[in-house]
Amino acid sequence: MVSVNIEAKKIVDRMIEGADDLKISVDKLENGSTVIDCGVNVDGSIKAGELYTAVCLGGLADVGISIPGDLSERFALPSVKIKTDFPAISTLGAQKAGWSVSVGDFFALGSGPARALALKPAETYEEIGYQDEADIAVLTLEADKLPGEDVTDKIAEECDVSPENVYVLVAPTSSLVGSIQISGRVVENGTYKMLEALHFDVNKVKYAAGIAPIAPVDPDSLKAMGKTNDAVLFGGRTYYYIESEEGDDIKSLAENLPSSASEGYGKPFYDVFKEADYDFYKIDKGMFAPAEVVINDLRTGEVFRAGFVNEELLMKSFGL
């Protein structure tokens, strides 16, 4: 079976080789681990954001940046495009922010292929029937500071690899790379909701594509988190090819999949998060979904469309 860590490492090698042009920095820790700063103490770049997103997806998706003219009638917004032939593995087996990395006073949300070694969380890998067995671990961290050896030692231990085979990429939410990679979760938001909220077998999703605008960079981490989530909730558009079985209600799946189908829909995410006392667990899981969904049922040939791009709320969130 394909290894998300080995595929991601190929992209990491490109980033290390082109670090100067990508405006990122590469540090080798004393334990041999490699830490790649993509926005903490460096500027990062659009290309770095594109590659970072591809690493998050375990190297099993094509990632691009474009400026489509049809999202807003008033102006064009730079957007992230995703397409994958391995939707369950690339989005839930790699990209999902499913590892809370906590060592001493360091805390970060971990995404990327190393999760498939540490099985974070185990239930996800049971659902998709996947586990990586590589001897290298590649993890991306959404954090405002860089990890030390104690953190990479912990990652190595959890992944059962040597510290010198650990590669960690770091980007704050309030950075350009951070903004790009969160919009790059547009397809994953849909597969996540299918599995976690709608309890649909995501292994039936055979191919997927999506696009979402890149939120403006905001130095305030909480406001940045709000804007980046809104980019997908109000501006993300996705297309899923599903091989259904007799009895699957794909029409209902499509109708319940967009963010607008959730109870908490209707306000910028920052306002919702604030009302929830900044507690993610108080927020309806169904809100974390793309704005618009199209599903092609490969068994029947039917196509279902639901949801819509909410330009008004998107512009309000972005301050435009």
Curated annotation (Swiss-Prot):
Q: Which UniProt keywords apply?
A: Cytoplasm, Hydrolase, Methanogenesis, One-carbon metabolism
Reaction(s) catalyzed by this protein?
5,10-methenyl-5,6,7,8-tetrahydromethanopterin + H2O = N(5)-formyl-5,6,7,8-tetrahydromethanopterin + H(+)
Please name the Pfam families in this protein's record.
MCH (PF02289)
Its subcellular locations are:
Cytoplasm
Coiled-coil ranges per UniProt: none
Q: Which GO terms describe its molecular function?
A: coenzyme F420-dependent N5,N10-methenyltetrahydromethanopterin reductase activity; methenyltetrahydromethanopterin cyclohydrolase activity
Keyword hit for Cytoplasm: yes
Tell me which GO cellular component terms the UniProt record holds.
cytoplasm
Q: In which pathway does it act?
A: One-carbon metabolism; methanogenesis from CO(2); 5,10-methenyl-5,6,7,8-tetrahydromethanopterin from CO(2): step 3/3
GO term, biological process aspect, one: methanogenesis, from carbon dioxide
Q: Which InterPro entries match?
A: METHMP_CycHdrlase (IPR003209)
Q: What is its EC number?
A: 3.5.4.27
Q: Which cysteines are joined by disulfide bonds?
A: none
Query: Which family, according to the similarity comment?
Result: Belongs to the MCH family.
Protein function: Catalyzes the reversible interconversion of 5-formyl-H(4)MPT to methenyl-H(4)MPT(+).
Could you give the subunit structure recorded for this chain?
Answer: Homodimer.
Q: Which NCBIfam families match?
A: one_C_mch (TIGR03120)
What protein name applies here? Answer: Methenyltetrahydromethanopterin cyclohydrolase
* Primary gene name: mch
